[in-house]
UniProtKB/Swiss-Prot annotation:
The modification Phosphotyrosine is found at Y432. The active site is at E254. Tubulin is the major constituent of microtubules, a cylinder consisting of laterally associated linear protofilaments composed of alpha- and beta-tubulin heterodimers. Microtubules grow by the addition of GTP-tubulin dimers to the microtubule end, where a stabilizing cap forms. Below the cap, tubulin dimers are in GDP-bound state, owing to GTPase activity of alpha-tubulin. Mg(2+) binds at E71. It is found in: Cytoplasm, Cytoskeleton. It comes from the Eukaryota. It catalyses: GTP + H2O = GDP + phosphate + H(+). Its EC number is 3.6.5.-. The lineage of its organism: Eukaryota, Metazoa, Chordata, Craniata, Vertebrata. A motif (MREC motif) lies at residues 1-4. This is Tubulin alpha-1C chain.
């Protein structure tokens, strides 16, 4: 089996975790108490969903997941919520005092008290796996736990499980709206620390999802529940190939092989289509060509940046539902003729396709319409550098005046770590710039063809 362990860190991670596991349960027909009425084989069934759920002797399905937060309130909601019977109590780990939006608290002071307990739980989950494939880590960049504790955890996971892939789903600070003043500090510190430990990080920014909810679903004032449900659809599409059988299945390592041209350039953009409300879906025929086109619209992306200014290095299209390869090939051929979509010159083919016959499931009473087919596009584009540049600029403005730095130093960090992290980010921006530059400039390599 190719099992995956999900680790949800901090408030953002835990709440996205709630949305994701709710959706997985609906997709697999697992009830909130972990029973699966349709499943006849109790015990070691090697159905695909066993990559995400382990089965007890009593026929109960338990998520292979750990929820961690340094303060109790958010995890207490899981402990008392609808799915409280789904999780083993030891999978829900909460501390006593939170990281107070402070990377240093999450990484050094408070984080180190709880890290061994967390690794212990992860080890227990890993021991139940026959062939652990890797970890999915959900967190935000801006929070103290999400940034500080995640980076500590990633470092330790690299030590304990060196070769296993680690994928991140990170909530990137939105350009306009902000949940914390020190977000730029936390984001840059955590990116610097986890850069060498993470194999692939899917970034999502809240503002982009707000706009999608407002524009496509006509929700005037989207709540975090709306955002998380939309996000869980994306996570579900990315992991669908691990949980269901399909025509072209994609596993975790396959993503990395196809999306990450250089180890540092591992921040693909996610785009999902169709995001459409039930009233509208009733009147629309969403063909494969239409939803594929929608993926290349900047408006449907999960991070605010404009790929029309950047170049694509690689692109994964993950279809699910009623989709046949012929339609996909036709849709991709059409896209390749469009001049607005530019690939770097050293990557001529650029499209990887996965097809899964399980149609997308929606949460009853949610905002998304039930559709026959959907697609999630993961693209590695140089436009992500815009997002980094924006963040670096905010960091510079604050750091020039050393604003708020004393909170970090007071928790045992050194000021040198800030400048070191900032230099690393500058290098990352430079890397993106170089990757996008044409390879044949100035030298006569073109003669061989």
């Amino acid at each position: 089996m190719r099992e995956c362990i999900s680790i949800h860190v901090g408030q953002a991670g835990v709440q996205i975790g709630n949305a994701c596991w709710e959706l997985y349960c609906l997709e697999h027909g697992i009830q909130p108490d972990g029973q699966m009425p349709s499943d006849k084989t109790i015990g070691g069934g090697d159905d695909s969903f066993n990559t995400f759920f382990s089965e007890t002797g009593a026929g109960k399905h338990v998520p292979r997941a750990v929820f961690v937060d340094l303060e109790p309130t958010v995890i207490d909601e899981v402990r008392t919520g609808t799915y409280r019977q789904l999780f083993h109590p030891e999978q829900l780990i909460s501390g006593k005092e939170d990281a107070a939006n402070n990377y240093a608290r999450g990484h050094y002071t408070i984080g180190k008290e709880i890290i061994d307990l967390v690794l212990d739980r992860v080890r227990k989950l890993a021991d139940q796996c026959t062939g652990l494939q890797g970890f999915l880590v959900f967190h935000s960049f801006g929070g103290g736990t999400g940034s500080g504790f995640t980076s500590l955890l990633m470092e330790r996971l690299s030590v304990d499980y060196g070769k296993k892939s680690k994928l991140e789903f990170s909530i990137y600070p939105a350009p306009q709206v902000s949940t914390a003043v020190v977000e730029p500090y936390n984001s840059i510190l955590t990116t610097h620390t986890t850069l060498e430990h993470s194999d692939c990080a899917f970034m999502v920014d809240n503002e982009a999802i707000y706009d999608i909810c407002r524009r496509n679903l006509d929700i005037e004032r989207p709540t975090y529940t709306n955002l998380n449900r939309l996000m869980s659809q994306i996570v579900s599409s990315i992991t669908a190939s691990l949980r269901f059988d399909g025509a072209l299945n994609v596993d975790l390592t396959e993503f990395q092989t196809n999306l990450v041209p250089y180890p540092r350039i591992h921040f693909p953009l996610a785009t999902y289509a169709p995001v459409i409300s039930a009233e509208k879906a009733y009147h629309e025929q969403l063909s494969v060509a239409e939803i594929t086109n929608a993926c290349f619209e900047p408006a449907n992306q999960m991070v605010k940046c404009d790929p029309r200014h950047g170049k694509y290095m690689a692109c994964c299209l993950l279809y699910r539902g009623d989709v046949v390869p012929k339609d996909v090939n036709a849709a991709i051929a059409t896209i390749k003729t469009k001049r607005t979509i530019q690939f770097v010159d050293w990557c001529p083919t650029g499209f990887k396709v996965g097809i899964n016959y399980q149609p997308p499931t929606v949460v009853p009473g949610g905002d998304l319409a039930k559709v026959q087919r959907a697609v999630c596009m993961l693209s590695n584009t140089t436009a992500v550098a815009e997002a980094w540049a924006r963040l670096d600029h905010k960091f510079d403005l604050m750091y020039a005046k050393r604003a708020f730095v004393h909170w970090y130093v007071g928790e045992g960090m050194e000021e040198g770590e800030f400048s070191e992290a900032r230099e690393d980010m500058a290098a990352l921006e430079k890397d993106y710039e170089e990757v996008g530059a044409d390879s044949a400039e100035g030298d006569d390599e073109g003669d061989e063809y």
